[in-house]
Design a protein with these regions (language model features):
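Surface-exposed aromatic
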Residues: 152-161
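Electron-transfer interface patches adjacent to heme c in soluble/periplasmic c-type cytochromes
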Residues: 77-137, 161-171
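Bacterial signal peptide processing site
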Residues: 17-19
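Positively charged n-region of N-terminal signal peptides that target proteins for export
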Residues: 1-4
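Electrostatic cytochrome c docking/interface patches
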Residues: 28-53, 66-68
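C-terminal capping alpha-helices of c-type cytochrome domains
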Residues: 130-146, 160-189
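C-terminal motif of bacterial Sec signal peptides marking the signal peptidase cleavage site
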Residues: 12-15
Length: 197
């Protein structure tokens, strides 16, 4: 009788348990399901514009106008590089040894490497308009002129080593933005080696 009573009591306790083993995994709330969105070209270009601005590309690649508060990027020639027709002042020989100097518009620099000129990075064919995205990535990550393997290195002050580990998505966004810019025709002068100054 005692065994029957214990068995009945255990049966009653088991019947009172309302927890049911799930037959399906619990539903994940919609807010936690990662959504894969196809990025639009406009979104890539906007991201690229943002990156170009925060990376300071206009500092060197845009000719300047002089205003009451100093130089500012010329809105008609944004990212078009050193103006082809702009003559440089005489280069101080001391700069070739221990200095790096910028011309007033910040589009030309002189130092032990000679004189370098900021490139035209607009969508014009005299800029990067005929470059592939792969060429652009090679220039940014490997420092090759026009992104062509075996070409001359990009010269100071271009900080390409800072971009060597930039994610593909950011390189692609910058390229998409630059290819959407107003094309500005401007063939930037070739660099001048120190022995020709």
């Amino acid at each position: 009788m005692r065994t029957l009573l214990i068995t009945a009591l255990l049966g009653l306790l088991a019947a009172c348990n309302t927890t049911v083993a799930p037959t399906e995994p619990p539903a994940v709330p919609p807010a936690t399901i990662p959504m894969v969105q196809e990025e639009t070209l406009e979104a890539r270009q906007e991201r690229g514009r943002y990156l170009v601005e925060i990376m300071g590309c206009n500092d060197c690649h845009s000719p300047k106008l002089m205003g009451p508060n100093g130089p500012y990027p010329d809105p008609d020639r944004l990212l078009s590089g050193h103006p082809a027709a702009q003559a440089l002042p005489a280069v101080p020989k001391a700069a070739l040894k221990d200095w790096a100097l910028f011309a007033m518009g910040n589009t030309a620099a002189v130092g032990p490497w000679g004189v370098s000129f900021a490139g035209n990075i607009t969508s014009d064919v005299t800029g990067i308009g005929s470059w592939s995205e792969e060429q652009f990535a090679n220039a940014m990550r490997k420092g090759w002129w026009k992104g062509i393997e075996g070409s001359r290195p990009l010269l100071p002050p271009m900080p390409w080593p800072n971009f060597a580990n930039m994610p593909d998505a950011d390189i692609s966004a910058i390229y998409a933005y630059l290819m959407s810019t107003k094309p500005v025709e401007n063939v930037v002068p070739a660099p001048v080696p120190p022995d020709q100054l």
